[in-house]
């Protein structure tokens, strides 16, 4: 649960001393310096640099005036000399100092034929309206415009609009690689690119290539080298203008002050009319290597790695460590433009720091955007094929292939696999100055996160450490020395894993316990943690790791970790591995004093015996298994509402101090999803020394097993705890099946179908109705009173609806049991997963779903069958059952034919090739030939089953242990997407370095299509439940993981509700929306209140910007109120609040930056709340922080009154379920974000809103009420013998899973009141009244069983469960009995 975190992160007073800075802090915190009197121009420049906190809410407060260079005034000898004005726009600031130096030198020449005025803009500055006006004003009298690397669409369009107006008037317009819209502005004499994308000439065809920007860049560089020589001898003006364009590109890529001087001279004399025929001489471009090796102390750039190594070996300035032949070698990837422009101070600092720490370096650079070739050419021994390096650190921040434009991740991954070393991607600040970054609670600018954090992750990049800042005056990069020191130390620590022997390596395995209780040690989603640890350690032992003393069984391992052997009496403590006295703690933990604000002096009362800090766990040889301390606020979550800057407690800090400084781990392995380290307070992305995750993890390489279906929180762990996240499989899914009365109902329906025409129909229907009522189905299916005479068609309809409901229960997928690392599912266990993979159409691969193929066989469309079944049409329900059973049968037969007698998959590819194309011998055809679907399309079936064969191989593959060992050996772990393997089988096999997706790539077209279907069904359902009226407002939740899995479906739902559509740019990135006309929409625009999870906020800040812009755009549309509820409510709220319409239209809310969850779940899980109002206040206090697209750099700002007014208009609340693995009661996130009862309290009429859940876990997407979904969840999981017996097979951890479902059910009662009494009654009958079950639970995990009993009593005490006094008395007796049993165990 990402609920383990704090309130807004604020830098404590003493923290500034810790912040990495290359120079005294005041030298770049310029806004805090008072200008001297009469400072004149210096004052204007100082005023141009304002602190972000006091700024206008944009990220960069630097003004372009710092980049304005004008000819010196008062030079009498140069009066009357023409003035040439040049305006340039660039992505990054490294050209600023080089351009400035070039222009100043030109203007200082006493014989100059022209005076140059140059002003530069960073593209991101153009978001600010005042700056944009200045830009347009500068263009109005400019001679020349230059643009480079303009790849952000909304800003590219602003540049295009401004330059286009002046293009014909200007003397020259030069745009170097940028978006096509801007490239078309190019104009140099007769040379133009206005037809870019349409011309047939090779030159333009080159620019059209978009599929591989790395290849594009390489081709560009070759063209730049050769074309001027060819064009020089062509007589036409057009050829000469094209030649000068290419020369311009050479000068620009050369980047040095000399090159830029000659560039400006060439353009001025060639194209500025006042200078035609002037005596201006310019030299040819000085060409640097396109790619090579650069070292600041080397005499030259090297194109041959052997030459570089020879020079390196003969250096006399090196320390003794560097002369050691076994010294680690770090490869560095650098941007050529920083080197040629002389903006390389940050690179020099990293190289010097690595060498000072005893690591050799090979710093490589490339001029294009493709580093895959240079990494092979310079970092790999051409003879042996082995890498020269032990780790690679990219200092560019960009993806390895493609830079900020179009990436080629497969090409990058192939190159990195050949290197096979850890790959770290560190970041220089691009869009912020150092001061702005330090002051920002968000951390990095969202555009930088998208381009330089998210994209490198797709290559397998780790550890986004900010190592360089930017000077606001000069634009030059400077090293942040503490960050550089950490980056270099961590890189060397990863490299050491490559060099150390297995026997000497030390590993700290960290497990979690949440909520804090002995019954919860080893908490992790879907994972049997101790069985998995035991499996891992057995394997590591075989490999040569020292795990001395490991017990003989996983059960014994649990006992040794969770029981304190030294306790004289019952102890709540776990096994104590180390007692750390306060003096030792303070001397080893540099930030210990900062924790005292929240926790007082150490040792405190958490993980402490009053004198020492206690580290819980157990050591086996060189492996330590430790229990991560809890966040600390669990027992009193209300404290978080009043604590200004939450922090970890002393015990938490002591744990990580022990791991790094005392145990001296070579690596830490966080075991399972998930702990609280990555959710500690600090910047969202791009942390500073003052951020707690950064301080806690220190310099230890972090490997983290994370559930494959949770890429969003895995990404938070990757970014905030510098983790190499390795995915593990969730347990194989099975169909829920039927039991007890539900099974009896199924049999009665079969009887009705065969006997309904024999006269026994009415009698059987009467039995069906009474049995359905006994099964509590009467709330889901409207049933008549028993004994009422029904005509045949009504009998069919009632039976059809009951049949559809039990089919829905029977076919629901549920994970059974818990996964064990190193134990992939057998082939037969994978059948249900394959059936669900086969149930989806995949039009992009021309694969038809199996239900679709079978429905077509009998002349039906599968969507029509789904709809008919939903309505209870008996014939359609029966046909759907036949299709479902035939699908399962065909796939089961196929799987059986690909496995050996042990149930293992053997050589699927060969077996498939022997099956395919042999008609009736194809196993799926053999099975279908016995059904009504005998004529199914063979070709479509072959295509589908070929795909399913590949999926089967992936499902049963076992890479989880292998990838862990690769990481421990300092090798590269292949990256892969996280998500739902049913929607996206590329998630498989697990064991990949899990990543999310390009945040600017969503929502996709497919997601938009699915979203429309769900929104239309939701609105229709609400109209039915609401007297035919549309809801005016829907309050909904956006989750990070869901949007990754579905490529933005719920994001697209919001856009469709308010009636806008996303618009993708040339590169497929979505940064813009446009309104859909009311005619096309066919309904009013629905108002929304959007609660973004903290993880969504971290991962998709660009999409929050998009949503806020969309809502405000809709509020400002001139439309009737009855057709635009956004505008209607915004106008009402503007009047009530006394604010502008735009501000009143604030609808995008989340936690404060660095904070997660409403903490309602913490309160429920720990039973630490008094009444529901307290929970609602907690929700409002923590979730009322708004995002403002007009001030994106301001972070999340508290707007509680706006939040309350918006919620008060909600007619419905809404959430999405997108995966069969996680449902409403599986995790506490869902009820933690549910505002149903809160909305009822805020509404003026006091009416409870309708509550809906969209279920897209199957091809037949549904919209159900919340209460329907809770009932379905209870029937298929908590009360289902198949599910709870599957959990009981996992022993200790299985009991905890059962208890967790009941606790989460109570959570839903607390926030929504949508849990029926019978659910608690049946749960009590199942787990308490059944004596055998009760004994099993108590014996297997008495601590979790105690919590189960306590939760039943709490449900009754809070009025959620009405039951007999006899039941309650039994529970009270049981509670005493289990307390005694626990004391007996511990004594």
Curated annotation (Swiss-Prot):
Keywords: ATP-binding, Chlorophyll biosynthesis, Chloroplast, Ligase, Membrane, Nucleotide-binding, Photosynthesis, Plastid, Transit peptide. It is found in: Plastid, Chloroplast stroma; Plastid, Chloroplast membrane. GO terms for cellular component: chloroplast; chloroplast membrane; chloroplast stroma. It is an enzyme of class 6 (ligase). Pathway: Porphyrin-containing compound metabolism; chlorophyll biosynthesis. It holds the Pfam family CobN-Mg_chel. CDD domains: CobN_like. One of its GO terms (molecular function) is ATP binding. One of its GO terms (biological process) is chlorophyll biosynthetic process. It is a peripheral membrane protein. It catalyses: protoporphyrin IX + Mg(2+) + ATP + H2O = Mg-protoporphyrin IX + ADP + phosphate + 3 H(+). InterPro entries: BchH, CobN/Mg_chltase, Mg_chelatase_H_N. The keyword Protease does not apply. Its EC number is 6.6.1.1. Its main location: plastid. Residues 1-50 form a transit peptide. The magnesium chelatase complex is a heterotrimer consisting of subunits CHLI, CHLD and CHLH. Belongs to the Mg-chelatase subunit H family. Involved in chlorophyll biosynthesis. Catalyzes the insertion of magnesium ion into protoporphyrin IX to yield Mg-protoporphyrin IX. The reaction takes place in two steps, with an ATP-dependent activation followed by an ATP-dependent chelation step. May be involved in the plastid-to-nucleus retrograde signaling. This is Magnesium-chelatase subunit ChlH, chloroplastic.
């Amino acid at each position: 649960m990402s609920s383990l975190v704090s309130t807004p992160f604020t830098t404590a007073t003493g923290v500034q001393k810790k912040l990495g800075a290359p120079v005294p802090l005041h030298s770049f915190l310029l806004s805090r310096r008072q200008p001297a009197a009469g400072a004149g121009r210096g004052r204007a420049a100082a005023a141009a640099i304002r602190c972000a906190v006091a700024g206008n809410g944009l990220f960069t407060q630097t003004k372009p005036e710092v980049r304005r260079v004008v000819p010196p005034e008062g030079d009498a000898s140069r009066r009357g000399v023409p003035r040439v004005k040049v305006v340039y726009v660039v992505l990054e600031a490294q050209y600023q100092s080089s351009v400035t130096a070039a222009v100043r030198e030109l203007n200082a020449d006493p014989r100059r034929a022209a005076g140059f005025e140059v002003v530069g803009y960073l593209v991101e500055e153009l978001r600010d309206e005042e700056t944009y006006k200045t830009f347009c004003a500068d263009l109005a009298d400019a001679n020349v415009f230059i643009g480079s690397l303009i790849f952000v669409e909304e800003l590219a369009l602003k540049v295009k609009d401004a330059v286009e107006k002046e293009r014909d008037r200007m003397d020259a317009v030069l745009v170097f690689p940028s978006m096509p819209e801007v490239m078309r502005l190019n104009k140099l004499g007769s040379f133009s690119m206005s037809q870019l994308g349409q011309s047939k000439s090779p030159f333009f065809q080159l620019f059209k290539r978009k599929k591989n920007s790395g290849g594009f860049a390489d081709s560009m560089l070759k063209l730049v080298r050769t074309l001027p020589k060819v064009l020089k001898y062509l007589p036409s003006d057009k050829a000469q203008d094209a030649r000068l364009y290419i020369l311009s590109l050479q000068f620009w890529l050369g980047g040095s002050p000399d090159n830029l001087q000659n560039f400006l001279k060439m353009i001025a004399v060639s194209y500025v009319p006042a200078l035609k025929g002037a005596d201006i001489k310019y030299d040819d471009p000085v060409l640097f290597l396109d790619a090579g090796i650069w070292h600041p102390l080397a005499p030259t750039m090297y194109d041959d790695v052997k030459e570089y190594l020879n020079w390196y070996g003969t250096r006399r300035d090196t320390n003794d460590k560097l002369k050691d032949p076994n010294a680690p070698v770090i490869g560095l990837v650098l941007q050529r433009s920083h080197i040629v422009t002389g903006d390389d101070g940050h690179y020099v600092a990293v190289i010097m720091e690595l060498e000072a720490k005893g690591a050799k370096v090979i710093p490589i650079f490339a001029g294009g955007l493709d580093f895959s070739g240079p990494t092979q050419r310079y970092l790999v021994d051409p003879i042996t094929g082995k890498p020269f390096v032990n780790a690679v650190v990219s200092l560019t921040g960009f993806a390895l292939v493609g830079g900020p434009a179009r990436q080629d991740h497969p090409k990058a991954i192939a190159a990195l696999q050949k290197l096979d070393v850890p790959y770290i991607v560190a970041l220089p600040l691009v869009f912020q100055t150092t001061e702005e970054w330090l002051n920002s609670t968000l951390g990095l600018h969202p555009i930088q996160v998208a381009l330089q954090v998210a994209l490198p992750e797709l290559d397998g990049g780790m550890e986004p450490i900010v190592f360089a800042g930017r000077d606001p005056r000069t634009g030059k990069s400077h090293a942040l020395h503490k960050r550089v020191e950490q980056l270099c130390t961590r890189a060397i620590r990863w490299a050491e894993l490559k060099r150390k022997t297995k026997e000497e390596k030390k590993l700290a395995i960290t497990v979690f316990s949440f909520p804090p209780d002995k019954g919860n040690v080893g908490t992790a989603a879907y994972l049997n943690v101790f069985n998995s640890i035991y499996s891992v350690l057995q394997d590591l032992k075989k490999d040569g790791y020292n795990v001395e003393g490991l017990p003989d069984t996983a059960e014994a391992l649990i006992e040794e970790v969770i029981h304190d052997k030294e306790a004289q009496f019952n102890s709540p403590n776990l096994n104590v591995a180390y007692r750390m006295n306060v003096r030792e703690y303070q001397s080893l933990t540099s930030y210990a004093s900062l924790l005292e604000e929240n926790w007082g002096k150490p040792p405190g009362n958490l993980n402490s015996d009053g004198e020492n800090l206690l580290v819980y766990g157990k050591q086996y040889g060189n492996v330590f298994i430790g229990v991560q301390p809890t966040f600390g606020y669990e027992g009193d979550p209300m404290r978080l509402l009043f604590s200004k800057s939450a922090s970890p407690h002393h015990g938490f800090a002591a744990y990580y101090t022990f791991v790094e400084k005392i145990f001296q781990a070579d690596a830490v392995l966080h075991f399972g999803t998930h702990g609280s380290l990555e959710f500690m307070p600090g910047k969202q992305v791009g942390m500073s020394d003052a951020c707690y995750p950064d301080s806690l993890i220190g310099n230890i390489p972090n490997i983290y097993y994370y559930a494959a279906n949770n890429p969003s929180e895995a990404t938070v762990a990757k970014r905030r705890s510098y983790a190499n996240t390795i995915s593990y499989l969730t347990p194989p899914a099975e169909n829920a099946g039927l039991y007890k009365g539900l099974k009896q109902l199924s049999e009665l329906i079969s009887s009705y179908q065969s006997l309904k025409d024999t006269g026994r129909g009415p009698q059987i229907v009467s039995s069906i109705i009474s049995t359905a009522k006994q099964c509590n189905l009467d709330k889901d299916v409207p049933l008549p009173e028993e004994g009422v005479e029904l005509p045949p068609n009504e009998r069919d309809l009632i039976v059809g609806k009951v049949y559809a409901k039990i089919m829905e229960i029977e076919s629901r997928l549920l994970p059974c049991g818990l996964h064990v690392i190193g134990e992939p599912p057998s082939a037969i266990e994978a059948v249900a997963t394959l059936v669900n993979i086969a149930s989806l159409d995949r039009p992009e691969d021309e694969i038809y779903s199996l239900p679709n193929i079978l429905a077509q066989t009998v002349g039906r469309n599968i969507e029509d069958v789904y709809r008919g079944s939903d309505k209870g049409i008996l014939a359609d329900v029966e046909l759907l059952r036949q299709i479902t059973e035939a699908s399962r049968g065909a796939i089961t037969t196929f799987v059986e034919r690909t496995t050996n007698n042990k149930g293992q998959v053997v050589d699927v590819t060969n077996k498939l090739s022997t099956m395919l194309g042999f008609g009736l011998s194809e196993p799926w055809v053999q099975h279908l030939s016995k059904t009504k679907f005998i004529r199914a399309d063979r070709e479509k079936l072959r295509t589908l089953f070929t795909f399913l064969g590949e999926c089967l191989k992936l499902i049963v593959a076992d890479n989880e242990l292998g990838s862990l060992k690769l990481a421990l050996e300092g090798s590269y772990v292949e990256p892969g997407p996280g998500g739902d393997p049913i929607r996206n089988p590329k998630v498989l096999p697990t064991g990949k370095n899990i990543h999310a997706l390009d945040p600017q790539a969503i929502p996709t077209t497919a997601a938009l299509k699915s979203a429309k279907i769900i929104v239309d069904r939701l609105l229709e359902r609400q109209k039915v439940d609401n007297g035919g009226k549309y809801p005016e407002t829907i309050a909904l939740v956006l989750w990070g993981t869901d949007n990754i899995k579905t490529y933005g479906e719920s994001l697209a739902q919001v856009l469709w509700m308010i009636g806008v559509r996303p618009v993708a740019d040339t590169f497929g990135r979505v940064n813009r929306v446009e309104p859909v006309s009311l005619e096309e929409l066919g309904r009013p625009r629905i108002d929304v209140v959007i609660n973004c999870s903290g993880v969504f906020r971290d991962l998709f800040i660009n999409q929050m910007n998009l949503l806020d812009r969309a809502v405000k755009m809709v509020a400002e549309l001139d439309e009737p109120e009855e057709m635009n509820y956004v505008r209607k409510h915004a106008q009402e709220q503007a009047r009530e609040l006394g604010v502008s319409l735009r501000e009143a239209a604030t609808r995008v809310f989340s936690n404060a930056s660095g904070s997660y969850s409403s903490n309602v779940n913490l309160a429920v899980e720990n039973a630490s709340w008094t009444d529901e109002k307290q929970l609602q206040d907690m929700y409002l206090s923590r979730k009322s922080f708004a995002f403002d697209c007009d001030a994106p750099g301001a972070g999340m700002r508290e707007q509680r009154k706006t939040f309350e007014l918006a919620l008060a208009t909600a007619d419905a609340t809404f959430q999405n379920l997108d995966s069969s693995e996680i449902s409403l009661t599986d995790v506490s996130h869902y009820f933690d974000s549910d505002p149903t009862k809160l909305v009822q309290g805020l509404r003026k009429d006091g009416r409870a809103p309708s509550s809906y859940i969209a279920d897209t876990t199957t091809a037949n997407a549904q919209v159900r009420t919340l209460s329907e979904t809770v009932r379905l969840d209870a029937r298929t999981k908590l009360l289902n013998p198949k599910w709870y017996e599957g959990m009981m097979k996992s022993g200790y951890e299985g009991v905890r899973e059962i208890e967790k479902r009941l606790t989460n059910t109570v959570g839903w009662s607390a926030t929504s009141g949508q849990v029926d009494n019978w659910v608690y009654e049946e749960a009590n009958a199942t787990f308490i009244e059944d004596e055998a079950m009760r004994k099993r639970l108590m014996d297997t995990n008495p601590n979790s069983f105690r919590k189960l009993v306590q939760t039943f009593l709490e449900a009754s005490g809070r009025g959620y469960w009405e039951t007999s006094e006899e039941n309650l008395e039994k529970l009270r007796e049981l509670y005493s009995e289990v307390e005694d049993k626990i004391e007996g165990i511990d004594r």
